[in-house]
């Protein structure tokens, strides 16, 4: 019997707002994975098409997350690993082996490996990167509608010039990571006033 391999990737580590989202994907052995690529290399419309295909054609997929409060409490690496563990735990079948994009393997209960650049070389990881990106981008777009003024739908929580300017003029909101330097600086300035 062929082994089941899960790929895991995350989106949102470098953001100053919103959760970190991880996805885990398992393909059936021998399944066609043509067209998958690192989510950062794909246009948003192509990511959406591929995400639909991944959800409908993969053997299993799941998404895990770590909230802003967990990121601030644990640190971003531990919170990322927590999101990855939650994604694997949510899979309807357990993998025999896990491949994670990056240089550190999370504390999973199954064996595996960390692969630097895995989102560009391993189909399961590429698929996970696509799902994580689509899920997180959608969440940030919803948050943008609920809390207008920060342009979250544009920068998705990354520390762009636009985001930093809006953060400075509006102050930090509940979705900002207070343990991250740009957010902390805004909070410190407003406390000093």
Swiss-Prot record:
It is found in: Cytoplasm. Its cofactor is Mn(2+); Mg(2+). Manganese or magnesium. Binds 1 divalent metal ion per monomer in the absence of substrate. May bind a second metal ion after substrate binding. It is an enzyme of class 3 (hydrolase). Keywords: Cytoplasm, Endonuclease, Hydrolase, Manganese, Metal-binding, Nuclease. Residues 3-192 form the RNase H type-2 domain. Its EC number is 3.1.26.4. Transmembrane segments: none annotated. One of its GO terms (cellular component) is cytoplasm. Pfam families: RNase_HII. CDD domains: RNase_HII_bacteria_HII_like. One of its GO terms (biological process) is DNA replication, removal of RNA primer. This is Ribonuclease HII. The gene is rnhB.
């Amino acid at each position: 019997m062929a082994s089941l391999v899960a790929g895991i990737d995350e989106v949102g580590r470098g953001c100053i707002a919103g959760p970190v989202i991880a996805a885990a994907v398992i393909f059936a052995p021998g399944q066609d994975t043509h067209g998958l690529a690192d989510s950062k290399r794909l246009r948003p419309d192509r990511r959406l098409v591929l995400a639909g295909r991944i959800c409908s054609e993969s053997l299993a997929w799941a998404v895990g997350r770590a909230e802003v409060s967990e990121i601030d409490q644990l640190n971003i690496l531990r919170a990322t690993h927590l999101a990855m563990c939650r994604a694997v735990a949510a899979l309807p079948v357990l993998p025999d082996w896990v491949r994670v994009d990056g240089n550190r393997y999370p504390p999973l209960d199954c064996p595996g490996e960390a692969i630097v650049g895995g989102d560009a070389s391993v189909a399961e990881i590429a698929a996970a990167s696509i799902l994580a990106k689509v899920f997180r981008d959608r969440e940030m777009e919803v948050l943008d509608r609920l809390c207008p003024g920060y342009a979250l739908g544009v920068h998705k929580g990354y520390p762009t010039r636009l985001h930093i300017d809006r953060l400075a003029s509006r102050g930090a909101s509940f979705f900002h990571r207070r343990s991250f330097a740009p957010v902390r600086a805004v909070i410190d300035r407003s406390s000093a006033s």
